[in-house]
Amino acid sequence: MAAPRGRAAPWTTALLLLLASQVLSPGSCADEEEVPEEWVLLHVVQGQIGAGNYSYLRLNHEGKIVLRMRSLKGDADLYVSASSLHPSFDDYELQSATCGPDAVSIPAHFRRPVGIGVYGHPSHLESEFEMKVYYDGTVEQHPFGEAAYPADGADAGQKHAGAPEDASQEEESVLWTILISILKLVLEILF
């Protein structure tokens, strides 16, 4: 049996008011990203890239930099290299190749300029992207309790105590790259 109309109206009105307040509240906007207060926005880069092509950028800022990229249309992937100004999916140190938002944290010890490659995935004829470049001003804690500040050059070439962990992450990254390449190849063959 249906509820009498007179009793349902107050609940409907309350529900509509609640939904309207959620939609109109300033924190509910999907376009706004939450970032730590220590991060400083340096640049916002927007661009378009054709399927299977690269767009290259150069980063000269010192310190720890965070790149956050979202695809406005299509699917753009992010490749970063300290050794090449034209990184690709075959030649890179850092990558983010997801179907959603991409993010890469560039360590302070990377040699500048850093090459950034934005790749337009072949599954879309054209991809549009927006990349936000942040300076990460957070102070890292040293394993022995002292604060570790960004390297000033004398320390930049030395390996940190977590080198075995870095090696396992690198191996995992290579495996993911191979898996993604195989999946892309299968998708290209099927479609």
Swiss-Prot record:
GO biological process terms on file: apoptotic process
The stretch of residues making up the signal peptide is 1-30
Subcellular location per the Swiss-Prot or TrEMBL entry? Secreted
Disulphide connectivity of cysteines? none
Q: Do you know which Pfam families this protein is assigned to?
A: UPF0669 (PF17065)
Key words, A-Z: Apoptosis, Glycoprotein, Secreted, Signal
Q: Which domain of life is it from?
A: Eukaryota
Q: Glycosylation positions?
A: 53
GO cellular component labels? azurophil granule lumen; extracellular region
Q: In which tissues is it expressed?
A: Mainly expressed in hepatocytes and some weak expression in germinal center cells of lymph nodes.
Described by its record, this protein's role is as follows:
May be involved in induction of apoptosis in CD4(+) T-cells, but not CD8(+) T-cells or hepatocytes.
Q: Give the record's family classification.
A: Belongs to the UPF0669 family.
Name-wise, this protein is UPF0669 protein C6orf120
Q: Which organism is it from?
A: Homo sapiens (Human)
